[in-house]
Regions:
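Acidic catalytic patch
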Residues: 69-96
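Short active-site oxyanion
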Residues: 37-40, 58, 77-79, 113-117
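Alpha-helix capping/helix-boundary segments
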Residues: 12, 46, 87, 107, ...
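Acidic, PIN/NYN-like endoribonuclease modules and their adjacent C-terminal/linker elements
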Residues: 1, 108-139
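Short, well-structured N-terminal submotif of metal-dependent ribonuclease cores
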Residues: 1-42, 56-70, 123, 137-139
Length: 139
């Protein structure tokens, strides 16, 4: 595992909290290892994305979104990763980026700038990582 740790995609965070069996065993093991080391990151953009998905009635949580975020982000070893100007700019400069989705671009930029491995099931991001643009792990 990278010394810098892991950043998890929004859907991975949702799965981790509600459907952990959807995660492959290698991803689950790496997430647990990163959490024990205090190197498990969730982007604040994932908080925003979950809030938007709830507001648009595209997902339902088992509790109000504010409470869900509070509880889910209290996972031992998990830290919130903010969006700093360098990440925002990097997201506009991703070489051959596979996504126009702003949250995915910000997650990829965060992983690149902080030398993190992005845990995702997004096939476009995984293929992008295989091209050497960032480190990724299949969820």
């Amino acid at each position: 595992m990278s010394d810098a740790g892991l950043v998890i995609d929004t859907h991975v965070w949702l799965w981790l909290e509600a459907e952990p069996d959807r995660l492959g065993e290698p991803a689950r093991a790496r997430i647990e290892q990163a959490a024990r080391a205090g190197k498990l990151w969730v982007s604040v953009m994932s908080v925003w994305e979950i809030g938007m998905l709830v507001a648009k009635d595209r997902i339902r949580l088992s509790m109000p979104v504010d409470e869900w975020v509070r509880q889910a982000s209290a996972t031992p070893g998990m830290q919130m990763l903010g969006v700093i100007p360098e990440i925002a700019l990097e997201s506009t400069r991703l070489p051959d980026a596979p996504h126009g989705d702003p949250v995915d671009r910000l997650l990829m930029a965060s992983a690149r700038l902080h030398n993190l491995t992005l845990v995702t099931a997004d096939e476009k991001i995984l293929a992008y990582a295989q091209q050497g643009h960032l480190k990724a792990l299949k969820a």
